Amino acid sequence: FEGNFIMAGVKFWPEMSQLDKDFLELASHFQQVVPIFTNVIFDTSQPHANTVFEDMFDWLDMVLEIARENRDTLFVIRAHPDETRVRKASRETVEGWATSREVQKEANIVFVSPRETLSSYELIQRSKFVMIYNSTIGLEASIMGAAVLCAGKARFTQYPTVFFPQTIDEVRRKMK
């Protein structure tokens, strides 16, 4: 998989980094890896996505709670690379959320900054399942054969290619 592409005049990821040996060593100490792909809060799809949770950060709070209950799973929270795009940077960021929640103190959580070019596709290939809010990488993960748990309504959640529970309790049950 290659990450060298242009969309809406923005060049994304001229190089995509493979999972390094430190990550692979860390992951080897867990039963499974679950990547969590976020969105940018300014994305025009966000207001329409919030049918189960108040917003993406409400969902991330629940993800953090579940991660703390499941120490045998490595959760990899991947901030959207567009989060820090020049002239579009979010005021409210996943990186800010991660800092305020001190996720770096959790042994079973890895936070991937929006500035890191870590391959999301390699994460998907190593995953037990993939969690998204409503990012289109969920559709890509589904095409790659991964089970995808969506927490927000997306352009593809009406098709039987992903899991899209309709209540917070159902999302919580599917996560376990």
Regions found by a protein language model. Name each.
Residues 1-54:
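A nucleotide-sugar donor-handling region in carbohydrate enzymes
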Residues 41-51, 76-85, 110, 122:
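Glycine- and acidic
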Residues 64-116:
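Catalytic donor nucleotide-activated moiety binding site of glycosyltransferases and closely related
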Residues 53-68:
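Histidine-anchored nucleotide/phosphate-binding helix
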Residues 115-163:
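A donor-sugar binding/catalytic signature common to diverse glycosyltransferases
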Residues 37-39, 78-82, 112-114, 132-134, ...:
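Generic beta-strand/beta-sheet core signal
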Residues 1-13, 160-176:
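Leloir-type glycosyltransferase catalytic cores
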